[in-house]
Curated annotation (Swiss-Prot):
The protein's name in its UniProt record: Ribonuclease Y
The protein's Enzyme Commission number: 3.1.-.-
Family: Belongs to the RNase Y family.
Transmembrane segments: 1-21
InterPro entries for this protein: HD/PDEase_dom, HD_domain, HDIG_dom, KH_dom, KH_dom_type_1, KH_dom_type_1_sf, Ribonuclease_Y, RNase_Y_N
Pfam families xref list: HD (PF01966), KH_1 (PF00013), RNase_Y_N (PF12072)
Subcellular location: Cell membrane
Originating gene: rny
Protein function: Endoribonuclease that initiates mRNA decay.
Organism of this sequence: Clostridium beijerinckii (strain ATCC 51743 / NCIMB 8052)
């Protein structure tokens, strides 16, 4: 009995131990499973993070590669454009060289033909003289001694007359050489005593920025700021990869100066929006007008020319913003005034008259875009309008031989103008031709009815026309653009194509009280 009870107890103990062991194993297994599941989840999360990082890295690398390709493409495009421009310049230079050679050959042909004609004439004269001598000898053989003596004296008289004519010609030639030598001495002395600085003008101006973020503010939302500034000033704003700088491009130096001053004021002020831009452009325009007056007064003071009419002084100041073949017209006028005065002093002429006429000789260039006719005649009319003396008026009008000169001072002004212009490096013809083409383009646009103002931009590849909204409706802008296209094609020679951009803007302004 005791044995059976012990066995039963052992069985129960074993059973309990088995259950405990089973539960323990089950708990351990469950804990391991949970640990493995948690570890698997962590591995999965890490894998997702790694995948996301790899994805971002790949996207970043792709963007960098795209940016690099885009920069390479832009660089290659710029290089190709530069190469095309260089080739165009070479073609133009070759064409000019061929034209010059063609003209030279034509002149040589004319010279050869003239020489051949002269040779034929000489041969004819020789033959005629031969026949005359032969006839004369035949006649003399039948004359008496007295008749022969008379003929001999007549021949001697003719020979002496011929020798006297040669002597007179030689004296005249020596006198002319002496006069030329004296003239060269006068001009050389004047040039040696006159030293003037010249700076060839360009069509661009670089405005420094405090940082590159300012470029975005200048452009404005959807480009409204840059459009407003370009429309109000007629100047191209070039914003490229140049760090902390924007470029102002315009063939008209006055517009470029107004745009520069307005932009610099806006940068300092910090408030850049269309209304503020209009205010600054208006203020800059007034500042430029004030500067023009100061430049005119300074030129008159520098050359000691006094008693000028205020409007003449203003026109003189405007010449600072005009160039002729790359030469600043105001500095050119000052140099001509100096040269004319110095030559007048050497020759004992009226120095004051020569300097005054020299300073004012190109005054017509200050308004010749607004009036028809040669600038010399326009300048003469202006001088007459503002009560200059008749000799000054004549010297101005005659410096390109448009009218007859009435004084020696007028001759000196013409000579001084030629000396200043002919100095090596003083002028560049290609820039002047380019500027004249842009001026002609604006002149064609302004000649149409309803046009308020026009600006040639993009180096002459685009003309922007602002029309009067009360005279031209929306349909009229299309018709105006077509008429302008026809006029430009008929009246202007240009490379490539020109974009005609007609803008009609209507504003309604009222005030709430």
């Amino acid at each position: 009995m005791v044995t059976a009870v012990m066995i039963l107890i052992d069985v129960i103990v074993l059973l309990i131990l088995g259950i405990v062991v089973y539960k323990t194993i089950q708990n351990i297994s469950k804990a391991k499973i949970e640990s493995l599941e948690k570890e698997a989840e962590e591995i999965l999360v890490r894998a997702k993070k790694d995948a996301e990082a790899t994805k971002k890295e790949a996207i970043l690398e792709a963007k960098e590669e795209l940016h690099k390709l885009r920069n390479d493409f832009d660089k290659e495009s710029r290089e190709r454009r530069n190469e095309i421009q260089r080739l165009e310049r070479r073609v133009i230079q070759r064409e000019e060289a061929l034209d010059k050679k063609s003209e030279l050959l034509e002149k040589k042909d004319e010279t050869i033909n003239q020489r051949m004609l002269e040779v034929d004439q000489v041969e004819a004269r020789v033959q005629k003289l031969y026949e005359e001598r032969r006839a004369e000898l035949e006649r003399i053989s039948a004359l008496s001694s007295e008749e022969a003596r008379e003929i001999l004296l007549d021949e001697i008289r003719k020979e002496i007359t011929h020798d006297a004519a040669l002597m007179i010609k030689d004296i005249e030639s020596k006198a002319k050489e002496e006069a030329d030598k004296r003239a060269r001495e006068v001009i050389t002395t004047a040039i040696q005593r006159c030293a003037a600085d010249h700076v060839s003008e360009s069509t661009v101006h670089v405005v420094a920025l405090p940082n590159d973020e300012m470029k975005g503010r200048i452009i404005g939302r959807e480009g409204r700021n840059i459009r407003t500034l370009e429309t109000l000033t007629g100047v191209d704003l070039i914003i490229d990869d140049t760090p902390e700088a924007v470029i102002l491009s315009s063939f008209d130096p006055i517009r470029r100066e107004v745009a520069r001053m307005a932009l610099e004021k806006l940068i300092v002020d910090g408030r850049i929006h269309p209304a503020r831009i209009e205010e600054m452009v208006e203020r800059a325009t007034k500042d430029v007008e004030s500067s023009i007056k100061e430049e005119g007064e300074q030129a008159a003071l520098e050359t000691s020319v006094h008693g000028l009419h205020p409007e003449i002084i203003r026109l003189l100041g405007r010449l600072k913003y005009r160039t002729s073949y790359g030469q600043n017209v105001l500095k050119h006028s000052i140099e001509v005034s100096y040269l004319a005065g110095l030559m007048a002093s050497e020759l004992g002429l009226d120095v004051t008259l020569a300097k005054r006429a020299g300073l004012l000789h190109d005054i017509g260039k200050a308004v010749d875009q607004e009036q028809e006719g040669p600038h010399a005649l326009i300048g003469g009319d202006l001088a007459k309008k503002y009560h200059e003396s008749p000799l000054v008026i004549n010297a101005i009008a005659a410096h390109h031989s448009d009218v007859e000169m009435q004084s020696l001072e007028a001759v000196l002004v013409q000579a001084a103008d030629a000396i200043s212009a002919a100095r090596p490096g003083a002028r560049r013809e290609t820039l002047e031709a380019y500027i004249k083409r842009l001026e002609k383009l604006e002149e064609i646009a302004n000649s149409h009815e309803g046009v308020e103002k026009s600006y040639a931009i993009q180096a002459g590849r685009e003309i922007r026309i602002m029309v009067k909204p009360d005279k031209v409706d929306d349909a009229g802008t299309i018709e105006l653009a077509r008429n302008l296209v026809k006029s430009v094609e008929e009246e202007l020679e240009y490379p490539g194509q020109i974009k005609i951009n007609v803008i009609r803007e209507t504003r309604a302004v009222d005030f709430a009280k």
